[in-house]
């Protein structure tokens, strides 16, 4: 039986997307105008979905895990160059966690078809976005209510996130149109296949 494993090329891609997540968390450091009501926007959902659509479920999820663990270990890769456990305990900590199942689910849905259509890319992107916001917003509500002790309703929490969700949904739609071409270019140049972990 052939054993499926990650090769050096797989690990390089995983590391690259973990690094892109760090860049996405702090995009306002180079583009300070990317804010809504004084709150910095993040490109992390975009890079999370891009990882899922290009790398597939397992590699993308591993990339998100690596990103979370690197930050938890003390590297300043989270928003506002924060690190450690504190960002997980904050109101946006749920989004850091959500990237893992979102990347896996979007990648898994895409892998159900060897040659997925743009519609399938779109649905995969929307599935990933929905998971991010379901987990992230619910976590934010619980954090505010249970340990930050800020009285807020679940509906208010969703209302606060609506503009961010609109932005990330729009980016997901755009991504679903450009990701197929990017993947085909990578596949043609390297033979990379998102549906399979390298085997020996």
From Swiss-Prot:
Keyword Lipoprotein among record annotations: no
Which Gene Ontology MF annotations are present? biotin transmembrane transporter activity
**Function noted in UniProt:** Putative biotin transporter.
GO cellular component, alphabetical, reads: plasma membrane
Compartmental location: Cell membrane
The record's comment on protein family reads: Belongs to the BioY family.
The alphabetical list of record keywords is: Cell membrane, Membrane, Transmembrane, Transmembrane helix, Transport
How does it sit in the bilayer?
A: Multi-pass membrane protein
Q: What is this protein called?
A: Putative biotin transporter BioYB
Query: InterPro entries under this entry?
Result: BioY (IPR003784)
Gene3D superfamilies hit by this protein: 1.10.1760.20
Membrane spanning residue stretches: 13-33, 36-56, 61-81, 90-110, 121-141, 158-178
Its predominant location is membrane
Q: Does the keyword Transit peptide apply?
A: no
User: A Pfam family in this protein?
Assistant: BioY
User: According to the lineage, what is the superkingdom?
Assistant: Bacteria
